[in-house]
Amino acid sequence: MARRRLDSELVRRGLARSREHARELIESGVVLVKGGTATKPATQVEESDAILVTEVDPSGHYVSRGAHKLIGALDRFADVVVTGRLCLDAGASTGGFTQVLLERGAARVLAVDVGYGQLAWPVRTDARVDVLERTNVRGLTAGALPFRPDLLVADLSFIPLELVLPALAGVAADTCDLVLMVKPQFEVGRAAVGDGVVREPALRASAVLG
C-alpha cells in the first residue's frame, strides 16, 4: 500500500490548505493519526490510516480553535482594549486571532502569514482586514505596511520569538500593546525537545521568562 508524508496526505485529503498549513497543524499538536498525536510532518502514513484534525472550533463559530487562545488572553489582560485599535496578527493562518480582534471592535487588522490561501473567507473579505501573505514576519518593515499597529498579536510556529521581536518592534507604533503566544518547543532548542513536547516544568518556565 502506498505511503505518503503526513503533511502531503493532509493536503490530499483536504484537511489542510497547503503543506505549510499542514506542518503548522502538526506542530500545534492538533493532528491525530490512528488516535495518537502526530508531531512530525515527515511521518509516513497509509491511505487507510485514520487521520483527524482537531483544530476546528467545536462551537462552529470561529474559523479555528486557535481563536480561544486569544480570547483567554484578552479576558485575562483586562487593560488591553481592542476597540478602535490598529492591529497586526502575526502568523494569522486561518484567521482565528484576526476574527477575535474584529469581534472586539478593532478598527483594522493586518493579517500576516508566510503561507498563502489559508485565511478563512469570512475573515479575508471583512473590509477591516488587510492581508499580507507569503511574508516572513522577520522581514517586516514599517514602510511596507499600510499602518503602524498599536496592538500586535502573534501565534507563530517553527521560530523563537526572540528572532522576530526586533522586526515586530520595528513596525509597531510608538505606544503598542503586544500579546504573544509562547510555544516552548520552539524556544528551548531542539536538544531539549523530545517527542515534540517540552515536558520539563523548568524548561517551560525558562521559555516564558527568558
Enumerate the language-model features and the residues they cover.
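Conserved S-adenosyl-L-methionine
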Residues: V100-R108
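A basic, amphipathic helix-loop patch mediating RNA/tRNA/ribosome contacts
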Residues: M1-E47, L86
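A short glycine-rich, Lys/Arg-flanked "PGG" loop and its adjoining helix->strand segment in the class I
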Residues: E162-V179
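Conserved alpha-helix/loop element of class I SAM-dependent methyltransferases that forms part
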Residues: G66-T83
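Conserved class I S-adenosyl-L-methionine
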Residues: V82-S93
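Residues at the N-terminus of the alpha-helix immediately C-terminal to the conserved SAM/SAH-binding loop
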Residues: S93-T98, G115
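Short, glycine-/aromatic-enriched active-site segment of Class I SAM-dependent methyltransferases
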Residues: P184-E200
